[in-house]
UniProtKB/Swiss-Prot annotation:
Pathway: Protein biosynthesis; polypeptide chain elongation. GO terms for biological process: peptide biosynthetic process. One of its GO terms (molecular function) is translation elongation factor activity. It comes from the Bacteria. It is found in: Cytoplasm. Involved in peptide bond synthesis. Stimulates efficient translation and peptide-bond synthesis on native or reconstituted 70S ribosomes in vitro. Probably functions indirectly by altering the affinity of the ribosome for aminoacyl-tRNA, thus increasing their reactivity as acceptors for peptidyl transferase. It comes from Corynebacterium urealyticum (strain ATCC 43042 / DSM 7109). GO terms for cellular component: cytoplasm. Coiled coil: none annotated. This is Elongation factor P. The lineage of its organism: Bacteria, Bacillati, Actinomycetota, Actinomycetes, Mycobacteriales. Keywords: Cytoplasm, Elongation factor, Protein biosynthesis. Belongs to the elongation factor P family. PANTHER family: ELONGATION FACTOR P (PTHR30053), ELONGATION FACTOR P (EF-P) FAMILY PROTEIN (PTHR30053:SF12).
Length: 187
């Protein structure tokens, strides 16, 4: 059992027989009345989000979640295949569990997968990855009509917006959560 004081983003709770992950939370102490905690919870199975308010100090059942470090091997078209780093067991994950950031994964990338009762719940990808630019148009000096960015295709096939000074062959750091360019990587 956990109390509202133990809440953290990413924590998985068992509420009304359903696994709910805390997306965000806020402790609120109004000037009048008791303190409470506002949360945004995501149903791990269906993916739906719901807002729920708890009184401060309320005990909530925390789900036992086993987090395992895994290595991304390949995508067979219908599922992502990962290997457990300790047992070398291969696991197939559906695209919904990997999220939108999966398009930035290279083979042998590290992924943290959470399991409950042997069933994969969700995957946490690295916050950012370094990827090579496979193709982008040359940025011309003084070309500011496009707002200072241009499309670029990464080595994974994903397309992002990059600044005009980025060229084909450069390595860039990409945020896997938002798909945005962060910086150029110098080697």
């Amino acid at each position: 059992m956990a109390t509202t004081a133990d809440f953290k983003n990413g924590m998985v709770l068992m509420i009304d027989g359903k696994l709910q992950q805390i997306v965000e939370f806020q402790h609120v102490k109004p000037g009048k009345g008791p303190a409470f905690v506002r949360t945004k919870l995501k149903d791990v199975v269906s993916g739906k989000t719901v807002d729920k308010t708890f009184n401060a100090g309320v005990k909530v059942e925390q789900a036992t979640v086993d987090r395992r470090d895994m290595t991304y091997l390949y995508n067979d078209g219908s599922a992502y295949v990962l290997m457990d780093d300790k047992t070398f067991e291969q696991v197939e994950l559906q695209p919904e569990l990997m999220g939108d950031g999966a398009k930035f994964l290279l083979e042998n990338s590290r992924v943290n997968v959470s399991f409950h009762d042997g069933q994969a719940l969700f995957a946490e990808l690295p916050a950012n990855v370094d990827l090579k630019i496979e193709h982008t148009d040359p940025g011309l000096q003084g070309d500011r009509s496009t707002g200072g960015s241009k499309p670029a295709t990464l080595e994974t096939g994903a397309e992002i917006q990059v600044p005009l000074f980025i060229e084909t062959g450069n390595v860039v750091k990409v945020d896997t959560r938002t798909g945005e360019y962060l910086s150029r990587v110098t080697q």
